[in-house]
């Protein structure tokens, strides 16, 4: 610590000022505050620092000194008296004294902590108020510029550590200069407060990532040393002890925030960093946590960010799933968010299907409505890229599909049934789902291949999706809805079993449907497409290569990496049971 080594020189320098008059009392030392160039006095006996010259008659100046040093000098003096368990009347409840170790008196360190840190803290707080204007210059810049100063000012660091736990290393205050020992103490204290910041002087460079150094400029540099005591008094009087500590401290935080505001957004962006900062700063000084200004915001940021993350996860899955269907199965949504997802999907489905069923009797339209509503939230299901963005196109495509393929025809009668009697929306929903299932059933009938085939995976996924959709239908206590749902589930399960039997290979994939909540959301458009493809196949015959290529393209779009999904599916199977 250059400061520590310099302290004797500092004494000499300051000697030019006050110490010219006469020697300091034993145990006292003069140091110069590198920031302001003002001399201040370190009482190693009581381990306090003060702006007031002990050689001045104690009456007024002593009082001023007490105010300068902290809310009350007596308090700080008392601390040393009860060194074993110092009492910190001056500290606000949240604040935690920062241990300050003096180089010279390593053996007495424990006491140093309390007595010394106390005054430092208070002074720093008052000064912080003063300093804030300049500090606002920019903590970051301050950190760099004042890295050098920090070497001298480590001592002050303790104070800053309490006020700005994260920033201690760069907080520069008279403390550094306050005592040659102070340099050590400050460094130790800073290290104590900031595990990551080694020597406080180094600390300025080593600040943990999120931390912003707080340059501390003392207002005193405006006033002359003689005036200092009075100036401090004035400050103290403005803010009685606790206020003195608190108000200035708030400025410190405000300043930090002012300069931090730029970093803050970043912090919000990266919840991890904000927790880090919150945590380390908290370690550094619970005092900081005491001040709602700083900590809460990181915390808030954290929670907010966390919530959005799940949300974002949930919402993207619909988007991505259409594109990589098989992938999405095991994808984050599947295992991680299934619970959340299912409700989301359920809601979407219910919302979509209810209006669908009520609004549009024709099956094709039903499908269209669903498709349009589902894709709208996730406009990037690439399986039907054009269709998804523009529901009208979807409608057209589906209408084509409906008239042309046989699968749509069976669906039509069902929809007709739905139309004729005014049915409960739940029943309509179930019927709409079963229409899709019918198309899938035909796809299953025409399916030949392995369980690893894209087509198999797609059909299975669609069926699973329909299963989940059926599960999501709310019977609302109506027996007819419940019965329809039950029948639909049975039907889907039998189709799934049939598909399994037809497929060769990899057993146990049926269970994937249990995992599929994630796929629910965006599969509807795919399903319609699938239905169309299946219809084409039925129409043209499996031998026809056109439908196959179509389906392959669709599948490729929907499930670009089939194999990854496959292992994932199998993994999912393991999980699902």
Swiss-Prot record:
Residues 22-56, 126-157 form the WW domain. One of its GO terms (cellular component) is Z disc. The modification Omega-N-methylarginine is found at residues 141, 267. The modification Phosphoserine is found at residues 138, 179, 204, 280-281, 285, 297, 380, 382, 390. There is a cross-link at residue 450 (Glycyl lysine isopeptide (Lys-Gly) (interchain with G-Cter in SUMO1)). Residues 158-204 have a biased composition (Low complexity). It is found in: Nucleus; Cytoplasm. Residues 1-17 have a biased composition (Polar residues). The modification Phosphothreonine is found at residue 291. SMART domains: BAG (SM00264), WW (SM00456). Signal peptide: none annotated. SUPFAM superfamilies: BAG domain, WW domain. Forms a ternary complex with HSPA1A/HSP70 and HSPB8, serving as scaffold subunit. Component of the chaperone-assisted selective autophagy (CASA) complex consisting of BAG3, HSPA8/HSC70, HSPB8 and STUB1/CHIP. Binds to the ATPase domain of HSP70 chaperones. Interacts with BCL2. Interacts with phospholipase C-gamma proteins. Interacts with DNAJB1 and DNAJB6. Interacts (via BAG domain) with HSF1; this interaction occurs in normal and heat-shocked cells. Interacts with HSPA8/HSC70 (via NBD), HSPA1A (via NBD) and HSPA1B (via NBD). Interacts (via WW domain 1) with SYNPO2 (via PPPY motif). Co-chaperone and adapter protein that connects different classes of molecular chaperones including heat shock proteins 70 (HSP70s), e.g. HSPA1A/HSP70 or HSPA8/HSC70, and small heat shock proteins (sHSPs), e.g. HSPB8. Acts as a nucleotide-exchange factor (NEF) promoting the release of ADP from HSP70s, thereby triggering client protein release. Nucleotide release is mediated via BAG3 binding to the nucleotide-binding domain (NBD) of HSP70s, whereas client release is mediated via its binding to the substrate-binding domain (SBD). Has anti-apoptotic activity. The BAG domain interacts with the nucleotide-binding domain (NBD) of HSP70s and is essential for the nucleotide-exchange factor activity. This is BAG family molecular chaperone regulator 3.
């Amino acid at each position: 610590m250059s400061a520590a080594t310099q302290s004797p020189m500092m004494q000499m320098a300051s000697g030019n000022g006050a110490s010219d008059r006469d020697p300091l009392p034993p145990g006292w030392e003069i140091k110069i505050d590198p920031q302001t160039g003002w001399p201040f006095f370190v009482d190693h006996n009581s381990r306090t620092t003060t702006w007031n010259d002990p050689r001045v008659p104690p009456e007024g100046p002593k009082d001023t000194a007490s105010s300068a040093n902290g809310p009350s000098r007596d308090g700080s003096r008392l601390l040393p008296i009860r060194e074993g368990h110092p009492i910190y009347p001056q500290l606000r409840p949240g604040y935690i004294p920062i241990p300050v170790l003096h180089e010279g008196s390593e053996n007495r360190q424990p006491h140093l902590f309390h007595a010394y840190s106390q005054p430092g803290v208070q002074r720093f707080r008052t000064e912080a108020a003063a300093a804030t204007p300049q500090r606002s210059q920019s903590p970051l810049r301050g950190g760099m510029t004042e890295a050098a100063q920090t070497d001298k000012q480590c001592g002050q660091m303790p104070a800053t550590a309490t006020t700005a736990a994260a920033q201690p290393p760069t907080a520069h205050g008279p403390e550094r200069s306050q005592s040659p020992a102070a340099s050590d103490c400050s460094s130790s204290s800073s290290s104590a407060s900031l595990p990551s910041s080694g020597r406080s002087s180094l600390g300025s460079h080593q600040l943990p990532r999120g931390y912003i150094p707080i340059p501390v400029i003392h207002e005193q540099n405006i006033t002359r040393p003689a005036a200092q005591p009075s100036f401090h008094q004035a400050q103290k009087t403005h803010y009685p002890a606790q206020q003195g500590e608190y108000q200035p401290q708030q400025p410190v935080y405000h300043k930090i925030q002012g300069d931090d505001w730029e970093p803050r957004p970043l912090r919000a962006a990266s919840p991890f960093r904000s927790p880090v900062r919150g945590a380390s700063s908290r370690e550094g000084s619970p005092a900081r946590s005491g001040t709602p200004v700083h900590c809460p915001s990181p915390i808030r940021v954290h929670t907010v960010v966390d919530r959005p993350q799940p949300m974002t996860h949930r919402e993207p899955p619909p988007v991505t799933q259409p594109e990589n269907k098989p992938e999405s199965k095991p994808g984050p949504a599947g295992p991680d968010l299934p619970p959340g997802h299912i409700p989301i999907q359920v809601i979407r489905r219910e919302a979509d299907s209810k209006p669908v069923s009520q609004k549009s009797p024709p099956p094709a339209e039903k499908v269209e409505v669903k498709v349009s509503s589902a894709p709208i939230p996730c406009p990037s299901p690439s399986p039907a890229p054009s269709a998804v963005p523009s529901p009208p196109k979807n409608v057209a495509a589906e209408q084509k599909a409906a008239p042309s393929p046989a699968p749509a025809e069976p669906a039509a009668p069902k929809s007709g049934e739905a139309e004729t009697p005014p049915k409960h929306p739940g029943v309509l929903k179930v019927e709409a789902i079963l229409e899709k299932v019918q198309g899938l059933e035909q796809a299953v009938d025409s399916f030949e291949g392995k369980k690893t085939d894209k087509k198999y995976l797609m059909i299975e996924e669609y069926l699973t999706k329909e299963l989940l959709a059926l599960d999501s239908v709310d019977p609302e206590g109506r027996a007819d809805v419940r019965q329809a749902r039950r029948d639909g589930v049975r039907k889907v399960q039998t189709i799934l079993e049939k598909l399994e039997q037809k497929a060769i290979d990899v057993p146990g994939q049926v269970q994937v449907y249990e995992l599929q909540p994630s796929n629910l959301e965006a599969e509807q458009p795919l399903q319609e497409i699938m239905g169309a493809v299946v219809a084409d196949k039925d129409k043209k015959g499996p031998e026809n290569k056109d439908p196959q290529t179509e389906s392959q393209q669709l599948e490729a779009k929907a499930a670009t990496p089939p194999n990854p999904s496959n292992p994932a599916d199998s993994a999912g199977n393991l999980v699902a049971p």
